[in-house]
């Protein structure tokens, strides 16, 4: 597969997962309304070819299903993402190999890292057209406004690239930007993010911070930029590790930064420390409008793009959204890393409906009383991204944590609310979460939905009903003989069981 956005669009079209829309659409509200309906139904990616006010087409919902995200990462099944997670786990906490086989596996990972180093493109497609000076007008890019209460037009899937003015180490993040004028935008990032750290360092040295925004990149690179990695590692290296070969980079025209050579658009500008403008409100992943915050102002002096570029975008909100699908894929990648940190956890799942981080379901191979509570506490402290997880449900390894019917059964049949529910008060809390009494401070809940063993219970636990293994195998062998071979039992319609989805 080609390592650019166009190659991915072509792949989706070949596999029947892209629809081209030739009717004129408005980037103000209409594009998002159409796309949201497709997202709710798990529909195909969309390419709007006739966008009001812009000569450029808009691509959206390309990563609207887990299947398509797997394709973006050159995979066919979500389980393959765990193999990638195993590589990252080795790199994060390498251990001396105890066996020859372990040494060979680690050697393979190191070889993959060597292959993943970025390359250079001295005649990049992203600079086929250069616009600067008085000709620069960001309104030419078909930026969308997703919700009626949004403050303005936004960029959502741009790679925001900055560099540490001391070490030269780049940071690549996916941050929201709001259009302020034809040459300026505000960037919304948390104080702990790499771009914010770089801006503070530039301020300490009395320098402007150079910024590049790469739009319309290979979705695989977006996934790499969204992966929490150690501060001193490069997202370009991670993207190469994800894709199996290095990312081709190009030097910007007016700033000392590098961007993916096959980007559809590149914006080049600077931030003067202390120069801020109000940013927001905008609809966010919590399903509400966020607040208004003073955010750094980026002044752009140059725009480059490919010939006939395609603008890639998305928007936040209540799941399902593309960000939720990305989170499900990252969930699989984190799994081996989490197992390395907390060995008793056999699997974990962050349900999309819980915003992909507010609630976690973890399974354990239970061996002693109190283990479920220990596993929940260990989960909260294992990785920084679990800091704001409000609910942790612990189940036995026999429970399919990705089947809500099994999880609800485990809670209903194995939990005594007095004994098995524990609350941690006054813990760090997501500032975007309105549920807490105090901003930034709230509680957490753990639920032990495992089978209880003495001394957790004083009575004998019931025996779980199971089919006879021999008969189950016999029925599977004779299924077609019964005349039922045309019935697919692997795809379940929840609406047949009382749900309204």
From Swiss-Prot:
An example Gene Ontology molecular-function term: 3-octaprenyl-4-hydroxybenzoate carboxy-lyase activity
Ranges that cross the membrane: none
GO biological process: ubiquinone biosynthetic process
Pfam family, one: UbiD_N
Gene3D superfamilies cross-referenced by the UniProt entry: Single helix bin, UbiD C-terminal domain-like
GO cellular component: cytoplasm; cytosol
Entries under InterPro entries matching the protein: UbiD, UbiD-like_C, UbiD-like_N, UbiD_Rift_dom
NCBIfam families given in the database record: UbiD family decarboxylase
Entry's family note: Belongs to the UbiD family.
Stated name of the protein: Uncharacterized protein sll0936
Organism lineage string: Bacteria, Bacillati, Cyanobacteriota, Cyanophyceae, Synechococcales
């Amino acid at each position: 597969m080609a390592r650019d956005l166009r190659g991915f669009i072509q792949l989706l079209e070949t596999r029947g997962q892209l629809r081209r829309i030739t009717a004129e659409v408005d980037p103000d509200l209409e594009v998002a309304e159409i796309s949201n309906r497709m997202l709710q139904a798990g529909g195909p990616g969309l390419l709007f070819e006739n966008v009001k006010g812009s000569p450029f087409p808009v691509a959206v919902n390309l990563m609207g299903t887990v299947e398509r995200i797997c394709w973006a990462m050159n995979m066919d099944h979500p389980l393959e993402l765990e193999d990638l997670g195993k590589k990252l786990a080795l790199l994060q906490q390498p251990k001396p190999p105890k066996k020859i086989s372990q040494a060979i596996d680690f050697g393979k990972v190191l070889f993959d890292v060597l292959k993943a180093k970025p390359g250079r493109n001295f005649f990049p497609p992203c600079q086929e057209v250069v616009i600067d000076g008085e000709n620069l007008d960001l309104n030419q890019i078909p930026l969308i406004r997703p919700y009626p209460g949004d403050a303005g037009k936004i960029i959502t899937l741009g790679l925001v690239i900055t560099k540490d003015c001391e070490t030269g180490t780049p940071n690549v993040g996916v941050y929201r930007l709001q259009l302020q004028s034809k040459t300026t935008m505000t960037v919304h990032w948390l104080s702990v993010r790499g771009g914010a750290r770089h801006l503070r360092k530039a301020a300490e040295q009395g320098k402007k911070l150079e910024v590049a925004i790469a739009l319309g990149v290979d979705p695989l690179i977006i996934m790499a930029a969204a992966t929490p990695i150690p501060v001193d590692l490069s997202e370009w290296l991670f993207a190469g590790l994800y894709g199996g070969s290095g990312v081709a980079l190009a030097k910007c025209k007016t700033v000392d930064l590098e961007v993916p050579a096959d980007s559809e658009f590149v914006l080049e500008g600077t931030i003067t420390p202390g120069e801020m403008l109000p940013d927001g409100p905008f609809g966010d992943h919590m399903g509400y409008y966020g607040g208004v915050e003073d955010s750094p102002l980026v002044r752009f002096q140059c725009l480059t793009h490919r010939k006939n570029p395609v603008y890639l975008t998305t928007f936040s909100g209540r799941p399902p959204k593309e960000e939720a699908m990305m989170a499900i894929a990252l969930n699989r990648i984190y799994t081996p890393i989490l197992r390395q940190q907390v060995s008793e956890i056999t699997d974990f799942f962050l349900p999309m409906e819980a915003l992909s981080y507010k609630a976690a379901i973890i399974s354990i191979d239970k061996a002693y009383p109190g283990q479920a509570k220990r596993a929940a506490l260990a989960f909260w402290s294992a990785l920084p991204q679990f800091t704001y997880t409000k609910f942790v449900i612990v189940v036995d390894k026999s429970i399919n944590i990705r089947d809500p019917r099994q999880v609800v059964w485990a809670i209903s049949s194995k939990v005594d609310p007095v004994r098995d529910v524990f609350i941690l008060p006054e813990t760090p809390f997501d500032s975007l979460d309105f549920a807490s009494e105090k901003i930034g401070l709230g509680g957490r809940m753990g639920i032990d939905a495992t089978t209880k063993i003495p001394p957790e219970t004083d009575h004998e636990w019931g025996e779980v009903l199971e089919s006879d293994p021999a008969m189950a195998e016999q029925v599977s062998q004779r299924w077609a003989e019964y005349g039922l071979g045309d019935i697919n039992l692997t795809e379940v319609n929840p609406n047949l069981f009382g749900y309204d989805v």
